[in-house]
């Protein structure tokens, strides 16, 4: 039982280190556009400034 507990503690420790590393990358580095495809699905990847047509005169 001690070997299983040691293995479980090691796995939890490794997972915590990986979690903190990934959180750091996403929070402090601007890496999300390179790893996330949500930006491409939403259509904001290649946005261009368009001329706006006002329909109401103030």
UniProtKB/Swiss-Prot annotation:
Name of the featured protein: Uncharacterized protein YpfB
Gene encoding the protein: ypfB
InterPro entries: DUF5359
Organism: Bacillus subtilis (strain 168)
């Amino acid at each position: 039982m001690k070997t299983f507990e040691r293995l479980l503690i090691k796995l939890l420790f490794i997972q915590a280190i990986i979690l903190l590393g990934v959180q750091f990358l996403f929070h402090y580095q601007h890496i999300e556009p390179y790893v996330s495809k949500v930006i491409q699905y939403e259509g904001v990847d290649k946005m261009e400034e368009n001329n706006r047509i006002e329909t109401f005169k103030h």
